[in-house]
Amino acid sequence: MRAVLTVIGKDNVGIVAGVSNKLAELNINIVDVSQTIMDGYFTMMMMCDISQITKEFDEVKTELTGKGEELQVKIHIQREEIFNAMHKL
């Protein structure tokens, strides 16, 4: 099972490390990642394998939201099938 994770906010030191460490803590594997800085704003999209999580998905979302607040960025995660349904042309 996979999920799409996005991170957006003002660029700052430690965002990638903070997000990656939190994902590892939650047993989430990063499958693919794209990241860029646009005019001082940090943007990152990750494809994640969530098949090994031991918590409910809603709890994972809550913990990632909290990590985003700590890092002063917005972190959003959703299951891949939901993401695809929302972005289908």
From Swiss-Prot:
PROSITE patterns associated with the record: ACT
CDD domains per UniProt: ACT_1ZPV
UniProt superkingdom: Bacteria
Entries under InterPro entries matching the protein: ACT-like_dom_sf (IPR045865), ACT_dom (IPR002912), UPF0237/GcvR_regulator (IPR050990), UPF0237_ACT (IPR022986)
Pfam families membership: ACT_6 (PF13740)
Domain named ACT: residues: 4-78
Family membership noted in the UniProt record: Belongs to the UPF0237 family.
Alphabetical list of NCBIfam families matching this protein: PRK00194.1
Protein name, per record: UPF0237 protein lin0537
Organism lineage string: Bacteria, Bacillati, Bacillota, Bacilli, Bacillales
